[in-house]
Protein backbone atom coordinates (compact mmCIF):
# COMPACT_ATOMS: atom_id res chain seq x y z
CA UNK A 1 0.00 0.00 0.00
CA UNK A 2 1.27 3.46 -0.94
CA UNK A 3 1.46 6.00 1.89
CA UNK A 4 0.99 9.65 0.96
CA UNK A 5 1.60 12.75 3.09
CA UNK A 6 -1.06 15.38 2.40
CA UNK A 7 -0.64 18.97 3.63
CA UNK A 8 -3.24 20.52 5.90
CA UNK A 9 -4.45 24.00 5.06
CA UNK A 10 -4.56 25.87 1.77
CA UNK A 11 -3.02 23.10 -0.36
CA UNK A 12 -5.21 20.24 0.89
CA UNK A 13 -8.21 20.55 -1.43
CA UNK A 14 -6.12 20.73 -4.61
CA UNK A 15 -3.84 17.96 -3.33
CA UNK A 16 -6.81 15.63 -2.84
CA UNK A 17 -8.13 16.59 -6.27
CA UNK A 18 -4.73 15.76 -7.79
CA UNK A 19 -4.70 12.24 -6.38
CA UNK A 20 -8.40 11.72 -7.13
CA UNK A 21 -7.74 12.35 -10.82
CA UNK A 22 -5.01 9.70 -10.60
CA UNK A 23 -7.44 7.16 -9.13
CA UNK A 24 -6.76 7.63 -5.41
CA UNK A 25 -9.72 9.25 -3.67
CA UNK A 26 -9.17 10.74 -0.21
CA UNK A 27 -12.21 13.03 -0.32
CA UNK A 28 -13.27 11.88 3.16
CA UNK A 29 -10.37 13.96 4.52
CA UNK A 30 -12.38 17.05 3.58
CA UNK A 31 -15.40 16.13 5.69
CA UNK A 32 -15.95 18.94 8.17
CA UNK A 33 -16.49 16.81 11.26
CA UNK A 34 -13.75 14.28 10.51
CA UNK A 35 -10.85 14.55 12.98
CA UNK A 36 -8.90 11.52 11.77
CA UNK A 37 -5.31 12.04 10.65
CA UNK A 38 -5.10 8.91 8.46
CA UNK A 39 -7.35 7.97 5.56
CA UNK A 40 -7.59 5.03 3.17
CA UNK A 41 -8.37 5.67 -0.46
CA UNK A 42 -11.68 4.32 -1.74
CA UNK A 43 -9.83 1.69 -3.75
CA UNK A 44 -7.85 0.55 -0.66
CA UNK A 45 -4.57 0.84 -2.61
CA UNK A 46 -3.22 3.80 -0.66
CA UNK A 47 -3.49 5.61 2.64
CA UNK A 48 -2.96 9.28 3.39
CA UNK A 49 -1.41 11.01 6.39
CA UNK A 50 -2.80 14.47 7.08
CA UNK A 51 0.15 16.56 8.32
CA UNK A 52 1.28 20.17 8.54
CA UNK A 53 2.69 21.52 5.29
CA UNK A 54 6.09 22.00 6.91
CA UNK A 55 6.19 18.38 8.07
CA UNK A 56 5.51 16.79 4.67
CA UNK A 57 9.21 16.62 3.63
CA UNK A 58 10.07 15.12 7.03
CA UNK A 59 7.60 12.24 6.69
CA UNK A 60 8.71 11.61 3.10
CA UNK A 61 12.44 11.90 3.83
CA UNK A 62 12.26 9.48 6.77
CA UNK A 63 10.22 6.96 4.79
CA UNK A 64 6.95 7.21 6.70
CA UNK A 65 5.36 8.36 3.45
CA UNK A 66 6.25 7.28 -0.08
CA UNK A 67 4.87 10.41 -1.73
CA UNK A 68 3.86 13.86 -0.57
CA UNK A 69 2.69 17.24 -1.77
CA UNK A 70 4.37 20.34 -0.37
CA UNK A 71 4.91 23.97 -1.26
CA UNK A 72 8.22 24.75 -2.94
CA UNK A 73 8.88 27.32 -0.20
CA UNK A 74 8.87 24.60 2.46
CA UNK A 75 10.81 22.17 0.28
CA UNK A 76 13.54 24.72 -0.40
CA UNK A 77 13.78 25.71 3.25
CA UNK A 78 13.89 22.15 4.61
CA UNK A 79 16.81 20.89 2.45
CA UNK A 80 15.86 17.29 3.30
CA UNK A 81 16.72 14.45 0.93
CA UNK A 82 13.63 13.72 -1.14
CA UNK A 83 13.00 12.96 -4.80
CA UNK A 84 11.61 16.08 -6.47
CA UNK A 85 9.13 14.67 -8.96
CA UNK A 86 6.61 17.17 -10.36
CA UNK A 87 5.64 20.83 -10.28
CA UNK A 88 1.87 20.60 -9.81
CA UNK A 89 1.24 24.26 -10.57
CA UNK A 90 -1.33 25.09 -7.90
CA UNK A 91 -0.91 27.08 -4.69
CA UNK A 92 1.14 29.72 -6.46
CA UNK A 93 2.60 32.64 -4.51
CA UNK A 94 5.77 34.72 -4.44
CA UNK A 95 8.47 34.67 -1.80
CA UNK A 96 8.93 38.39 -1.42
CA UNK A 97 10.87 41.11 0.35
CA UNK A 98 8.56 43.75 1.82
CA UNK A 99 8.98 46.96 3.79
CA UNK A 100 6.76 49.64 5.32
CA UNK A 101 4.98 51.65 2.64
CA UNK A 102 6.13 54.95 4.12
CA UNK A 103 9.80 53.93 4.22
CA UNK A 104 12.39 55.19 1.75
CA UNK A 105 13.36 51.67 0.67
CA UNK A 106 12.54 51.07 -2.99
CA UNK A 107 14.93 48.18 -3.64
CA UNK A 108 16.94 45.69 -1.54
CA UNK A 109 20.17 47.69 -1.74
CA UNK A 110 18.41 50.65 -0.10
CA UNK A 111 18.24 48.73 3.18
CA UNK A 112 20.83 49.87 5.74
CA UNK A 113 23.72 47.52 6.50
CA UNK A 114 23.12 45.17 9.43
CA UNK A 115 19.41 45.99 9.60
CA UNK A 116 16.99 43.40 10.95
CA UNK A 117 14.83 41.34 8.57
CA UNK A 118 12.02 39.19 10.00
CA UNK A 119 11.12 35.88 8.38
CA UNK A 120 9.83 32.36 8.93
CA UNK A 121 12.18 31.28 6.14
CA UNK A 122 15.56 32.02 7.66
CA UNK A 123 17.67 29.88 5.28
CA UNK A 124 15.99 31.42 2.25
CA UNK A 125 16.32 34.95 3.62
CA UNK A 126 19.95 34.49 4.63
CA UNK A 127 20.91 33.03 1.24
CA UNK A 128 19.12 35.85 -0.59
CA UNK A 129 20.97 38.62 1.23
CA UNK A 130 24.30 36.79 1.01
CA UNK A 131 23.92 36.61 -2.77
CA UNK A 132 23.25 40.35 -2.83
CA UNK A 133 26.23 40.91 -0.49
CA UNK A 134 24.00 42.85 1.90
CA UNK A 135 24.81 42.22 5.60
CA UNK A 136 21.60 41.86 7.62
CA UNK A 137 20.43 40.22 10.84
CA UNK A 138 17.71 37.64 10.23
CA UNK A 139 15.08 37.53 12.99
CA UNK A 140 13.25 34.20 13.06
CA UNK A 141 9.50 34.57 13.63
CA UNK A 142 6.95 31.77 13.36
CA UNK A 143 3.79 33.88 13.40
CA UNK A 144 2.71 37.09 11.69
CA UNK A 145 6.00 38.48 10.39
CA UNK A 146 4.22 41.68 9.29
CA UNK A 147 4.45 42.79 12.92
CA UNK A 148 8.23 43.05 12.59
CA UNK A 149 8.21 46.36 10.67
CA UNK A 150 4.98 47.55 12.34
CA UNK A 151 6.54 47.35 15.81
CA UNK A 152 9.92 48.63 14.65
CA UNK A 153 11.69 45.36 15.43
CA UNK A 154 12.66 44.87 11.77
CA UNK A 155 13.13 47.04 8.71
CA UNK A 156 11.81 44.40 6.32
CA UNK A 157 10.29 40.94 6.02
CA UNK A 158 10.81 37.96 3.74
CA UNK A 159 7.55 36.04 3.43
CA UNK A 160 5.08 34.38 1.07
CA UNK A 161 2.75 36.75 -0.75
CA UNK A 162 -0.29 35.49 -2.66
CA UNK A 163 -2.66 38.39 -3.31
CA UNK A 164 -0.80 41.09 -1.40
CA UNK A 165 -3.92 41.85 0.66
CA UNK A 166 -2.25 41.15 4.01
CA UNK A 167 0.67 43.41 3.13
CA UNK A 168 -1.65 46.21 2.09
CA UNK A 169 -3.79 45.92 5.21
CA UNK A 170 -0.66 46.25 7.35
CA UNK A 171 0.90 49.15 5.48
CA UNK A 172 3.61 47.12 3.73
CA UNK A 173 4.73 46.91 0.09
CA UNK A 174 6.86 44.48 -1.90
CA UNK A 175 10.20 45.70 -3.18
CA UNK A 176 11.49 42.41 -4.61
CA UNK A 177 10.46 38.83 -5.41
CA UNK A 178 12.88 36.04 -4.55
CA UNK A 179 11.08 33.24 -6.42
CA UNK A 180 7.65 31.85 -7.31
CA UNK A 181 6.43 28.95 -5.19
CA UNK A 182 3.97 26.25 -6.27
CA UNK A 183 2.93 22.84 -4.92
CA UNK A 184 5.39 20.03 -5.66
CA UNK A 185 5.09 16.26 -5.69
CA UNK A 186 7.95 14.64 -3.81
CA UNK A 187 8.93 11.03 -3.12
CA UNK A 188 11.06 8.98 -0.76
CA UNK A 189 14.26 7.99 -2.63
CA UNK A 190 14.35 4.45 -1.22
CA UNK A 191 10.67 3.87 -1.98
CA UNK A 192 11.33 4.98 -5.53
CA UNK A 193 14.21 2.50 -5.91
CA UNK A 194 12.24 -0.41 -4.43
CA UNK A 195 9.05 0.44 -6.31
CA UNK A 196 7.13 -2.40 -7.98
CA UNK A 197 5.57 0.09 -10.43
CA UNK A 198 2.75 1.18 -8.10
CA UNK A 199 4.50 4.47 -7.35
CA UNK A 200 5.60 4.90 -10.94
CA UNK A 201 2.07 4.35 -12.24
CA UNK A 202 0.66 6.85 -9.73
CA UNK A 203 3.26 9.47 -10.65
CA UNK A 204 2.63 8.98 -14.36
CA UNK A 205 -1.13 9.27 -13.80
CA UNK A 206 -0.65 12.52 -11.89
CA UNK A 207 1.69 13.84 -14.56
CA UNK A 208 -0.75 13.04 -17.38
CA UNK A 209 -3.86 14.40 -15.64
CA UNK A 210 -2.01 17.48 -14.40
CA UNK A 211 -0.99 18.32 -17.97
CA UNK A 212 -4.61 18.51 -19.14
UniProtKB/Swiss-Prot annotation:
Q: GO: which molecular function terms?
A: ATP binding; ATP phosphoribosyltransferase activity
Q: Major location, coarse class?
A: cytoplasm
The main enzyme category here is transferase
The pathway where this protein functions is:
Amino-acid biosynthesis; L-histidine biosynthesis; L-histidine from 5-phospho-alpha-D-ribose 1-diphosphate: step 1/9
Q: Which UniProt keywords apply?
A: Amino-acid biosynthesis, ATP-binding, Cytoplasm, Glycosyltransferase, Histidine biosynthesis, Nucleotide-binding, Transferase
Starting at the broadest rank, the lineage of the source organism is: Bacteria, Bacillati, Cyanobacteriota, Cyanophyceae, Synechococcales
Please write the reaction equations for the catalytic activity of this protein: 1-(5-phospho-beta-D-ribosyl)-ATP + diphosphate = 5-phospho-alpha-D-ribose 1-diphosphate + ATP
Signal sequence region = none
Q: How does it assemble?
A: Heteromultimer composed of HisG and HisZ subunits.
- Gene name, please? hisG
| Record GO biological process | L-histidine biosynthetic process
Write down the Gene3D superfamilies for this protein, in alphabetical order: Periplasmic binding protein-like II (3.40.190.10)
What job does the chain carry out? Catalyzes the condensation of ATP and 5-phosphoribose 1-diphosphate to form N'-(5'-phosphoribosyl)-ATP (PR-ATP). Has a crucial role in the pathway because the rate of histidine biosynthesis seems to be controlled primarily by regulation of HisG enzymatic activity.
Species of provenance: Prochlorococcus marinus (strain AS9601)
Q: What is this protein called?
A: ATP phosphoribosyltransferase
Q: What is its EC number?
A: 2.4.2.17
